[in-house]
């Protein structure tokens, strides 16, 4: 079902959604960093937060990789649109001569 949902979204909307996920991950990482620096934690609590931080960091890395891929795909789509537009413009110009 995830693939069907992904296919229905435009690349721009996918980029927006991925940017939101990246922003949320960065915010959560900042919150965890503040907790690790400022709060007095037990060894177990510290390990738990560091494990969560590691998990969020890897998730953030995956999201950023996916975002880079989506931006590349968006760039290709834009170039294709420009090429089609130019083709029609040249065709129209030749037809009206």
From Swiss-Prot:
Keywords, ordered alphabetically: Coiled coil, Membrane, Transmembrane, Transmembrane helix
Subcellular location: Membrane
Bilayer-crossing regions: 78-95
Key word Cell division present: no
Xref: InterPro entries: CCDC-167
Keyword Mitochondrion: no
Superkingdom of this protein's organism: Eukaryota
GO cellular component labels: membrane
Alphabetical list of Pfam families matching this protein: CCDC-167
Membrane topology: Single-pass membrane protein
Coiled-coil portions: 36-80
Main subcellular localisation: membrane
PANTHER family recorded: COILED-COIL DOMAIN-CONTAINING PROTEIN 167 (PTHR31759:SF1)
Official protein name in the record: Coiled-coil domain-containing protein 167
Organism: Xenopus tropicalis (Western clawed frog)
Lineage: Eukaryota, Metazoa, Chordata, Craniata, Vertebrata
């Amino acid at each position: 079902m995830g693939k069907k949902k992904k296919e229905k979204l435009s690349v721009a909307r996918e980029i927006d959604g991925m940017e939101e996920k990246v922003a949320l991950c960065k915010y959560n990482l900042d919150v965890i960093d503040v907790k690790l620096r400022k709060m007095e934690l037990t060894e177990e609590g510290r390990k738990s937060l560091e494990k969560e931080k590691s998990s969020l960091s890897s998730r953030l890395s995956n999201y950023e990789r996916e975002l880079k891929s989506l931006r590349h795909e968006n760039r290709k789509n834009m170039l294709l649109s420009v090429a089609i537009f130019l083709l029609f413009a040249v065709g129209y110009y030749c037809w009206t001569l």
